[in-house]
């Protein structure tokens, strides 16, 4: 509208005597008294007005459609190689390692989160984490595949559950597998897990224990361990069809979780 009005002004005064240079300033439109609109000056002003109008339209669009704007920003950040995610190996699997510089710490006084790693098929990608999600700010990461399922990593301070475990906690210090899943399973599925555990297993890698659980439908695999002053809950899930078709891959993903 601003640009159209200015263009109409310039057209209306074309053909009149040119205004002298000392009668106008850079920020002033010529008066309607004898004089006119120089083509070069009009073009320069219109160009400046176009830039201002374009900026105004862009700002208004971002305010009116914040979700779309944020989605574009997020898409730009995630385009190409995701930070922490390796190139596919010969089987088409990639390894994600939490970047050392990634933010997160759950409050003043907490040490940096000790990095973790896991492997996923090539079509799995990181998705945004919302504070409105189950688990709130303790969800450190989400990945998903439209075909196979989704996963999340919850990193919870153990001080929430016990205050005498120190700053270098092992999962066995918290308790046996049954105690851990009953206490922390609700952090993952949002409800009591009593009677829902189909199987449990204890694995050891590089001297660290990992408790592995499979829960009944809605299907979920949970790997739990502890490091520093935090408990790590790695969950992998899918709908009924995904579970049936891709159980082997989902199981492999869940078993790949490591503290590094």
UniProtKB/Swiss-Prot annotation:
One of its GO terms (biological process) is photosynthesis. One of its GO terms (cellular component) is chloroplast thylakoid. Pfam families: PsbP. It is found in: Plastid, Chloroplast thylakoid lumen. InterPro entries: Mog1/PsbP_a/b/a-sand (IPR016123), PsbP_C (IPR002683). Keywords: Chloroplast, Plastid, Thylakoid, Transit peptide. Gene3D superfamilies: Mog1/PsbP, alpha/beta/alpha sandwich. One of its GO terms (molecular function) is calcium ion binding. PANTHER family: PSBP DOMAIN-CONTAINING PROTEIN 4, CHLOROPLASTIC (PTHR31407:SF38), PTHR31407. Belongs to the PsbP family. This is PsbP domain-containing protein 4, chloroplastic. It comes from Arabidopsis thaliana. The lineage of its organism: Eukaryota, Viridiplantae, Streptophyta, Embryophyta, Tracheophyta. The gene is PPD4.
């Amino acid at each position: 509208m601003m640009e159209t009005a200015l263009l109409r002004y310039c057209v209306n005064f074309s053909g009149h005597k040119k205004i002298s240079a000392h009668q106008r300033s850079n920020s002033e439109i010529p008066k309607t008294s004898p004089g006119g609109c120089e083509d070069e000056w009009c073009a320069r002003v219109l160009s400046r007005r176009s830039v201002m109008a374009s900026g105004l339209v862009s700002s208004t669009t971002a305010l009116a459609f914040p979700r779309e704007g944020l989605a574009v920003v997020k898409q730009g950040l995630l385009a190409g190689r995701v930070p922490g995610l390796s190139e596919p190996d010969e089987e088409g699997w990639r390894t994600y390692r939490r970047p050392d510089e990634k933010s997160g710490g759950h409050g003043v006084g907490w040490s940096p989160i000790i990095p973790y790693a896991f492997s996923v098929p090539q079509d799995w990608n990181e998705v945004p984490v919302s504070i409105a999600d189950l688990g709130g700010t303790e969800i450190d990461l989400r990945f998903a595949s439209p075909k196979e399922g989704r996963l999340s990593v919850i990193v919870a301070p153990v001080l929430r559950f016990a205050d005498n475990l120190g700053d270098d906690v092992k999962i066995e210090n918290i308790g046996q597998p049954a105690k851990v899943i009953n206490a922390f399973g609700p952090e993952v599925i949002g409800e009591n897990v009593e009677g829902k555990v189909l199987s449990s297993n204890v694995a050891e890698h590089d001297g660290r224990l990992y408790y592995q659980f499979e829960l009944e439908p809605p299907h979920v695999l949970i790997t739990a361990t502890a490091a520093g002053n935090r408990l790590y809950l790695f969950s992998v899930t899918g709908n009924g069809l995904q579970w049936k078709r891709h159980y082997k891959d989902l199981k492999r993903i869940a078993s790949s979780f490591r503290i590094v």
